[in-house]
Amino acid sequence: MKLRLFTFPNILTLCNLLSGCAAVIFALCINDLEQAFWCVLVAAVFDFLDGFAARLMEVSSPVGKELDSLADMISFGLAPASILYSIYVATGGDELSGFAVFILVAFSALRLAKFNLDERQATEFIGLPKPACAMFFASVGYIMQQNAAAAPPVAAIVASVVFSLLLISPIPMFALKFKHFDFAGNELRYIFLGISLVLLGLYQVRALPFIILAYILVSIVRFLIRRGKSPKISA
């Protein structure tokens, strides 16, 4: 079987990967979390574009699927963990104990393996999507460096554990995927998008962590409401 490596979608995926590598360098070697944020954002754009291009061009291959997973591990696993490590050290944490935040990489790998095998994620995500997790930490790093803000070092470790568990949680998280563009059936998506765009327009990057936390909270509340309404089977 002949494998095509350099298709246009695969080139976009490689751009995603390289953007993630740049984010790691900015976070760990240059200690520039503002540039690291932009690199993660660019990686997320390429991550969207490669899938869009593959569907548009009807180019799908096993190579593309595997390459996408490998790129995501760097851009949305290693890069945010590197940013979190830099935050931990910058706020007074010990360099060696800061290794604990890289639990995020391990759980990102578990999340990827689960996503690749779980067929229930066509219309919604099961657990927190990796790009959302990555953008949360990237934007927090950007804000903290730009405003010279500080936090207890232990907060970085706690955050890494909480978000690691969210990555592999069984909680359905709504996806911004539209089967149609009618408001009926897409109420939550349109309302969330509208509020998010307003907040981004007003507060730019500073709004991102709150938007992502709101996304998580709304998804959890939605899950609990659904579970409360589901019929209980009596013995």
Feature map (PLM): residue ranges:
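Topogenic membrane-insertion module of multi-pass membrane proteins
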Residues: 1-51, 200, 222, 232-235
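Short, amphipathic, aromatic/basic-enriched membrane-interface segments that mark the entry/exit
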Residues: 2-11, 65-70, 122-129, 175-186
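Multi-pass membrane catalytic core of lipid/isoprenoid biosynthesis enzymes
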Residues: 9-15, 56-113
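Hydrophobic alpha-helical transmembrane segments of polytopic
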Residues: 12-15, 36-43, 100-107, 133, ...
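Alpha-helical transmembrane segments of polytopic integral membrane proteins
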Residues: 21-24, 42, 46, 80, ...
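Helix-coil boundary and interhelical linker segments in multi-pass alpha-helical membrane proteins
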Residues: 22-39, 78-102, 139-156, 201-206
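C-terminal ends of transmembrane helices
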Residues: 50-61, 107-123, 168-177, 220-227
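C-terminal membrane-associated helical module and adjoining short loops/tails
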Residues: 126-235
